[in-house]
A protein has these predicted regions:
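Alpha-helical transmembrane segments of integral membrane proteins
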Residues: 195-196
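Glycine-rich loop-to-alpha-helix module at the N-terminal edge of alpha/beta enzyme cores
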Residues: 2, 42-128
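Generic beta-strand/beta-sheet core signal
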Residues: 38, 191-192
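Short, well-ordered beta-strand elements within core beta-sheets of diverse protein domains
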Residues: 34, 54-55, 168-169
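Single conserved hydrophobic/aromatic residue that forms the stacking wall/gate
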Residues: 199-211
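Active-site and channel-lining beta-strand-loop segments
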Residues: 24-45
Length: 211
């Protein structure tokens, strides 16, 4: 490790909030499936921004589209329509088979939106405020309070109690354990098809049963 990299890491440790255990490298650029640190060392990137950047680095179509949009407008808020959002929603509907699209900034925000949508739908149906959500043990859904509440790993939750209420947990790929938690108060079941924190993959037959 070069002295320059050591200096950057020391500065980061002093200035950045310690929310993650970071690897002792300072990244500089990417190309295809590879990343390079400031010393020029090459890494095969299996992380992809934690599964959010599957296109790789220096993807020409992506870069060209991004540069073209920057020259027009970067952000307008949801109070207005814009062409890229409309076109993206059309394409997402086509491949997903869903009726509507809701754009968010992060996975945690998407989970928060899903929790709110499920609870609001159930509330509008019967006026009750004690509906339950079933989540999976060993899951990870994000670091916001709602997402933490449906995260099935105590080590992420313990310092932030109390969580939001009426959350129950079952085991992935154990249909009976899910069924045991279902009551007339259940308004949603939240699960990952692949639990990255445990590398646990949902079996298609059990996923179909829950669906």
């Amino acid at each position: 490790m070069s002295d320059t990299m050591k200096e950057y890491i020391a500065e980061a440790e002093k200035d950045l909030l310690h929310t993650y255990n970071r690897y002792q490298i300072v990244l500089d650029k990417g190309d295809g499936v590879y990343l390079y640190d400031i010393d020029g060392k090459k890494y095969l990137d299996f992380v992809a921004g934690i599964a959010v950047f599957a296109l790789g680095y220096q993807n020409k179509a992506y870069n060209d589209a991004l540069k073209a949009q920057i020259d027009k407008v970067i952000h307008t808020s949801n109070y207005y329509y814009n062409v890229p959002a409309i076109e993206a929603a059309r394409k997402i509907k086509k491949v997903s088979g869903m009726d509507r699209v809701f754009f968010t900034n992060s996975g945690a925000e998407a989970v928060e939106g899903a929790i709110k949508a499920a609870r609001k739908y159930a509330y509008l149906k019967d006026g009750c405020t004690d509906h339950e959500i079933i989540a999976m043990n060993h899951s990870f859904h994000g670091r916001t309070m709602g997402a933490l509440s449906v995260t099935g790993n105590p080590k992420y939750r313990e310092a932030f109690q109390p969580m939001i209420g009426h959350i129950k947990f079952a085991d992935l790929n154990n249909f009976q354990s899910v069924l045991d938690q279902v009551t007339d108060k259940t308004c949603a079941i939240i699960m990952e098809t692949v639990q990255l924190s445990l590398i646990h993959i949902s079996e298609p037959t059990r996923l179909a049963l829950i669906s």
